[in-house]
């Protein structure tokens, strides 16, 4: 309903919906500690569970598309617990990724990849193809919730300057904005990005 209402009332900006990824969903259904053991001792059963979770999420994402949403962010935080040798095919957003999952994310075929604040965005952009949108990765707690308007502006400009030569970069929070985050901090982030984008010094194609 929220996606439908947003799509009906917001016409000048893309409306992006969100959902959890198949491995994170499976972990919540099966228990995260249990599934980390089960992927080794019961791989066939876990594959079946992941398949069912994936099938459900495909239907859910299609339903979101039918509401008029421009796209969907699939958050897959639990995949940060996996090593690079654990082969799962859907990895789009990963709060815990410290670099070991980046290659798997690129190979997923997603049109956009969203990274948490645990990674270096400058280093990650060097690994990502220029035709894939790369998003992230301001710390949602330290910067948005615990920071001040001044520090939010400073951190936002710092990341924009670091990534200025990558036109496929879209600045955002590294994960969900926590409850009770000061509204002033969110507004400051948006205003800072808008001013930067309208600056004559901003490289062509920047976000």
Locations of regions flagged by a protein language model:
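Active-site loop segments of alpha/beta catalytic cores
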Residues: 1-207
């Amino acid at each position: 309903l929220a996606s439908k209402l947003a799509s009906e009332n917001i016409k000048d900006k893309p409306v992006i919906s969100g959902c959890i990824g198949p491995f994170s969903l499976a972990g919540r259904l099966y228990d995260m500690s249990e599934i980390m053991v089960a992927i080794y001792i019961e791989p066939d059963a876990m594959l079946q569970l992941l398949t069912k979770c994936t099938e459900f999420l495909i239907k859910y994402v299609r339903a979101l598309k039918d509401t008029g949403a421009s796209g969907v962010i699939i958050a897959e935080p639990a995949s940060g617990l996996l090593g690079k040798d654990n082969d799962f095919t859907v990895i789009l957003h990963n709060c815990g990724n410290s670099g070991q999952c980046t290659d798997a994310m690129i190979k997923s075929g997603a049109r956009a990849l969203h990274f948490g604040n645990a990674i270096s965005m400058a280093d990650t952009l060097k690994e990502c193809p220029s035709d894939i949108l790369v998003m992230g990765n301001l710390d949602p707690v330290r910067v948005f919730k615990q920071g001040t308007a001044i520090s939010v502006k400073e951190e936002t400009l710092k990341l924009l300057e670091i990534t200025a030569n990558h036109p496929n970069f879209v600045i955002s929070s590294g994960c969900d904005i926590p409850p009770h985050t000061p509204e002033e901090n969110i507004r400051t982030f948006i205003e800072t990005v808008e001013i930067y984008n309208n600056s004559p010094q901003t490289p062509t194609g920047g976000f």
